[in-house]
């Protein structure tokens, strides 16, 4: 038998996939045709020239050779001609099709974002997902890429297979753009259903059997009820920015839509935050969802440094200006980017060369990779605070942008883009508006209004100190906010440093450091604010509105814990609370600290005698004896209360101790404190207990504390009786060890993210509305007072937008507006002569599909058919007008058909026309030659 070939045949893994990736590409074809002339001879693999005749029967050597060749082929990027192959870990490793990879490369995506890297593999495994991601983090591609991969191509069976619900028209348009760009290599049909567009055109689109529907909940529910749509064919559902969907009042629409979806669908829910109402919705509408949350969103960066400034309520505006001027060193006037744009020549701005320059500059300047040291976000409580702070900071000369929940989507996009591009250094926002904004170039965060929950604080400051960069957060803390500061300190598990009680040795990244601002600079800024409020009536009016909004915000925000409220009284009453913050460590701040101490001593001075006792020496004892007795009684009462409070404070740690450690009955003559401590010292330790408890083992500690608890004299008979349980055979229902977290981690079905309810408990966070309105799911009154009719009316009609109109019950039982069943779809079918609509699962009708293609192409149908006009009626008043119209129509038809009148009226005259023209000309000449009548 002849020996086989020296090198093994090429395996399928070594197949060149360039043609599959870039087929039907004009650019790649041109590159290949131009490269044919310059093609170099293919390099030989060195191992192919080796002699393998001696290793014919060596299978291990062949396997090693094949593995080596495959490894080298996968490692070298030169095998793909004309293209650059990305390293592993990108989109190529996710098992996507060639057309989709080509569309992703054309879109400019090279490396998936963190949310895409975590979400796409889970979605490809047909699991329901709850993803927490902000706008700008790539979440749109995170659910569009798997959707296109799953749907692949257009289905001739009737029924949409993908549904994406967005809260606004603008966001739906952005999603449609991404779907069209990523689905370029497929024949998937996508429609957009938003309010404001013609219902008849949307009827045509839905009748043409689209594959993907991108819609707002209100318009989609309208079409569902009007057209009686069957949603049983939908396999892929996405709720984009679900928190905004609930916030904008789409809860009833979402419930009705969710009721009509099939149970075997795959549901994805993306949101910037996870309120409690959204958790309940996810548990009801999703099947065993997986919570995907980035680690950077749930913890504070170790590179973040925090500073907390204790201020008074009347000093908040001045403190904000002082931080911007003195701490951050924020420049006033236009920013550098704004100056560059202003410096461009207006005449040459629209030239082609300058356009090319600006385009290249915008591509070169990547906003995500060019942070500035002055980019700052200021968090305020309500939208009224945002308006007020924007006007105040703009008056101070800063470049400011602002965003709040009720702002128009276009205006919101413009304001955020100005901040991202560097046209403004400060962005004033509310928690509700900022939850969906992803700004990776942030350097500073200022909490103008202190957050009411530690999770909200982490959500705010988590936007800075990313990717190894340093960042600062500055918080203004009033006396009323001190309990929330202590809650935050306990949540973070860090040391609380107030003022300079520990000297200058503090770590702003590991400690919660609080203190006051320098009085001189703060007073100057407060005086400037007072002057502006006196001069500008508009800003003063905005401050009045913000004050009223703050009262409502204080009433509706969460309350702090009771223990933190008790501790806050002691912290606020201490002298260190108002002392200079350790952040200011220069010589002037030291002098300011000494000045504050002197003022505190002067302010805390209390004379030894009251005015009544001083007057005794002047007037006499007889006249002031009654006043002196009153003062003595008050002073005695106060001294007794002080002693009692000290005794209670010292004996607090003995409340839970055994009675053997408390005061003995036979030592009543001693003081309470002395007796307690003497008894504690006289009690002998139990047998076998070591003096040094830090060196005791676990078993010794168990014996020690068990005998320690059994030494109590007031034991019950049940506890003192011998136990019937035999330790050799009895199995306890409670675990013997305390490492429950370790046992849960080893469980197959009890991992960190397997239980959505448990995983979402740490991620749940409710944000207060920035307009004072209650969020979805919060309790509210069902009735309201109608001033016009002088009676209580139902509030539900105001919430669903029907304003007292008639409501009907939907399929899910929820009330929907009766205007959804208006009969316009039946009129559209009669007008378009459409009979029975095909049902879900049937083959699509070709005429309806053609109508959809025409609607998607953007070209509207125009009536071009010409018919003979009706004969004019002599009895009508417009007979002459209609007759002329009919004559003109006949002339046009004759010109099109050809003949005597083809191409318009003939210019050639016959003999009759010439004779008539000569007569008219002769008459004119005779008339002009007549002599005048005056002669």
From Swiss-Prot:
Compositional bias of kind Basic and acidic residues: 662-673, 866-881, 906-916
Gene from which this protein is expressed: dbp10
Residue spans of biased composition, Basic residues class: 35-45
Any GO BP annotation: rRNA processing
Alphabetized UniProt keyword annotations: ATP-binding, Helicase, Hydrolase, Nucleotide-binding, Nucleus, Ribosome biogenesis, RNA-binding, rRNA processing
Residue ranges constituting the Helicase ATP-binding domain according to the UniProt record: 120-292
Lineage: Eukaryota, Fungi, Dikarya, Ascomycota, Pezizomycotina
Organism: Aspergillus clavatus (strain ATCC 1007 / CBS 513.65 / DSM 816 / NCTC 3887 / NRRL 1 / QM 1276 / 107)
Domain remarks: The Q motif is unique to and characteristic of the DEAD box family of RNA helicases and controls ATP binding and hydrolysis.
Descriptive protein name: ATP-dependent RNA helicase dbp10
Protein's cellular compartments: Nucleus, Nucleolus
TM annotation in the entry: none
